[in-house]
Amino acid sequence: MSKMNKLEHIRNIGICAHIDAGKTTTTERILYYTGKSHKIGEVHDGGATMDWMEQEQERGITITSAATTCRWQDKIINIIDTPGHVDFTIEVERSLRVLDGAVAVFDGVAGVEPQSETVWRQADKYNVPRMCFVNKMDRMGADFYRCVEMIKDRLGAKPLVLQLPVGIEENFKGIIDLVKMKAVIWKDESLGAEYCEEDIPADMKDKAEEYRAKLLDMVVELDDTIMEKYLSGEEVTEEEIKRLIRKGTISAAFYPVLCGSAFKNKGVQPLLDAVVYFLPSPIDIGIVKGIEVSTGEEKDFPVSVIEPFAALAFKIMNDPFVGSLTFIRIYSGKIASGITVINTVKNKKEKIGRMLLMHANNREDVKEASAGDIVALAGLKDTTTGDTLSDVDKQVILERMEFPEPVIELAVEPKSTADQEKMGLALSRLAAEDPSFRVSMDHETGQTVIKGMGELHLEIIIDRMRREFKVEANIGAPQVAYRETITKACEIDYTHKKQSGGAGQFARVKIIFEPLKEVKDLEDEDKNKTFVFASKIVGGAVPKEYIPGVEKGLNNIRETGVIAGYPMIDFKATLVDGAFHDVDSSVLAFEIAAKAAFREGMPKGDPKLLEPIMKVEVITPDEYMGDIIGDLNSRRGQIQSMDPRGNAQVVTANVPLAEMFGYVNTLRSLSQGRAQFSMIFSHYDQVPSQVADIIKAKK
């Protein structure tokens, strides 16, 4: 197979879903039918191939996106298994950045759940073409048609139904293929490996005709010639329909919807066929955006084997046998063991040692890899998630990934002196793997503080510290990651002078601080930042070489705000004037001046305390609804919506994270264990003054 031809044969896909929608089971079945896995792993018994960290096998949830390579027909499918729990959305975000297409798995009973919405929005952000697989069609209460409506209403997406279920709940036995207009029925005794095509059952003929007409109406819109043919009553061929479905899927004109039951081994092979037929190859994506290092200009780089090498590191993992593994997606060029490449973000060279193709936790050594491939590199020294590896002579930086701020933190203390050093190493390794996990030192108490996206996230980090690094630690109670901000603009003119014999220090800075939301001319790249620095110095009032000192000083000091010592966010600092001394000025002097200007100036900006607000969704039987809403209101919650779902009610509310600790036990007792909830970070908002006073008093 020629190299360019090989690109057409690759599918880099992710399988994304809400926790428990059956995503890992679906991936397992794909590996089974593509011949990479000889025994079907079940999440229920902790034996799934993709869930390979011990914690995942115990909890039955997928934490790490393991990359797996398999083949179907003549295509290579690289699957990134993404976690479905809200605390791990960072993993999903990372994998979506390097995918060409995705399969969104929905629970046929629950439909579109909160995490499904979150993942869908993340996929929108990266323009990932995707198709939908409505799973669990064999379960009590499964409703394919309701799920399709929810995809339309909740996600605002345009579903293109390609299959209908044959039989419902425990009688589910197959699908109707609306492209071929045939029924596909599975034989239970063959573990789903054997199925046969039959005529459409008589009682489903009308429904199949109705949905076939809807399908044709949607796809022919993409091609004027075929539309004329269709409108004049001519038959549209199967090949033409498939070509148009592919075109519409890649352009996100619509999202194909398939159905099945992965657990009962039904519907997996047609899903694989659809991945191959309809999801894009790296060539269909065509270009990747990046910055040419030599000119600093943003450019579009073609995805091609003959272009210079460029790859994005999207995951770092510690492997017990190989050590640190860096997963990369190669966008252009090729790479071989023994060559040297450059990390253009850190400006450090890296020598390529072992290269591995991963199959969950089995590995296969390869000597070279090229555009379109996803491989793991062993032994890289300086590369972390989001970095670009590039050809040394033709350097590029691919667009960086953005990572959310952690919302929860807790103190950890090693149990013994022996654990002290090991803990430092363990935490720095875990932070290199996971950019949404941060480690810092509390300057007042001297404690190590770890920060993450939720209680489960930090629980698993501590668990991994114990299991993988053999570190025993005492854990403090979880704390909310409060922030501070200013609500009005203010200006400060500060002069730092130090004369005590020998070389002195001198720096004068005039800085305007303003809330980000009031800044009119914010650059696009600054819109997602929490702090923006700009210099409007003219005429050399502050020499160029000293300006980075001002930015560094502000960046350091903003970590301890002026109200209660929490990090200061959502503000812009503009250096507008200043003065220097030929002998006594230095970068350090300007750094000190900037810090003092912050301390003196920020209190004039009417600073306020901010707290993380969570989007909480509670699913409850009708009879507990009143009590649950009353309880959410008592937690300073704001009810956003109440919707019926089957015979239950879904309550969505925005609630401060500080009020949600221990909610799982309250909900259990309010509903006799029948209600469930999920929550995800929504935004930061001002803390009411009476609550802010209590928080300040505790600091």
Swiss-Prot record:
GO cellular component, one term: cytoplasm
GO MF annotation, one: translation elongation factor activity
SUPFAM superfamilies: EF-G C-terminal domain-like, P-loop containing nucleoside triphosphate hydrolases, Ribosomal protein S5 domain 2-like, Translation proteins
Keywords carried by this UniProt record: Cytoplasm, Elongation factor, GTP-binding, Nucleotide-binding, Protein biosynthesis
Gene Ontology biological process: ribosome disassembly
Positions bound to GTP: 17-24, 81-85, 135-138
Localization per record: Cytoplasm
Record InterPro entries: EF-G-like_DII (IPR053905), EFG_II (IPR041095), EFG_III (IPR009022), EFG_III/V (IPR035647), EFG_IV (IPR047872), EFG_V (IPR035649), EFG_V-like (IPR000640), G_TR_CS (IPR031157)
Gene3D superfamilies, A to Z: 3.30.230.10, 3.30.70.240, Elongation Factor G (Translational Gtpase), domain 3, P-loop containing nucleotide triphosphate hydrolases, Translation factors
Coiled-coil stretches: none
Predominant localisation class: cytoplasm
A Pfam family it matches: GTP_EFTU
Ranges of residues in domain tr-type G: 8-283
Physiological role: Catalyzes the GTP-dependent ribosomal translocation step during translation elongation. During this step, the ribosome changes from the pre-translocational (PRE) to the post-translocational (POST) state as the newly formed A-site-bound peptidyl-tRNA and P-site-bound deacylated tRNA move to the P and E sites, respectively. Catalyzes the coordinated movement of the two tRNA molecules, the mRNA and conformational changes in the ribosome.
Membership in a protein family: Belongs to the TRAFAC class translation factor GTPase superfamily. Classic translation factor GTPase family. EF-G/EF-2 subfamily.
NCBIfam families linked to this entry: EF-G, PRK12740.1-5, small_GTP
Protein name: Elongation factor G
Organism: Rickettsia akari (strain Hartford)
Lineage summary: Bacteria, Pseudomonadati, Pseudomonadota, Alphaproteobacteria, Rickettsiales
